[in-house]
Amino acid sequence: MSGTIFIISAPSGSGKSSLVNELRHVVPGLEFSISYTTRAPRGSEQNGREYFFVTREKFDAMLAADEFLEHAEVFGECYGTAKHFVTEALARGNDLVLDIDVQGAAQLKVKLPDAVGIFILPPSRKELEARLKRRNLSDHVAPEVIERRLKGAGKEIENFSHYDYILVNDNFETAVEQLRAIVLAERIRRSSTQISEENRAILEAAECCIRKNAMQRVQSILDSFKDATDPQP
């Protein structure tokens, strides 16, 4: 059985990295692509675990050598997925998780049309702003930087329709369970074995995150960003 590529994207501050890290512990047999980035590590991040932290010169050299399957610049920093992570995982028949932004995801969906896209949303603009402020408090990030990221998030969220599943991270434990269900549901659909009651429950849990079934929740989140940018009377 061939492996599945899972593309996971989210606006900055939506909790994507924490969810993906937890997914490592609750779903066996998953491989994780580690992106290269020119940005500095945050908090407890370690080189080779969350990212490979490289200089701009190193990144540009890899780009010139055609080592990236996708790459993008986000808030002035470069991110890229090395080709070998994907080719090696597919050769082994393993599932692979790619934690990338919407620019990189768009590139990959062209090259890997069968990849499963998962978009993680914050519950509202207000909550995302609060999360960004908490995360950046120790880094002494200027208010205008947070505002720029909020505006960027509003634009990123408009890309939700390019993804197969939509997951709202308003409760971490629930979001982890939904993310786990999505991955396992895709495995079940690829399998020819009879569906058990346990598997049926997994399929039902994933079903609520399919884009068309999450539209009411998505619309309220979109509205929260629109309301913040509309001029007040």
Swiss-Prot record:
Primary gene name: gmk
Catalytically driven reaction(s): GMP + ATP = GDP + ADP
EC number: 2.7.4.8
Keyword annotations from UniProtKB, A to Z: ATP-binding, Cytoplasm, Kinase, Nucleotide-binding, Transferase
Classification via NCBIfam families: guanyl_kin
Gene Ontology MF terms: ATP binding; guanylate kinase activity
Domain of life: Bacteria
InterPro entries: GK/Ca_channel_bsu, Guanylate_kin-like_dom, Guanylate_kinase, Guanylate_kinase_CS, P-loop_NTPase
Organism of provenance: Koribacter versatilis (strain Ellin345)
Protein name: Guanylate kinase
Gene Ontology CC annotations of this record: cytosol
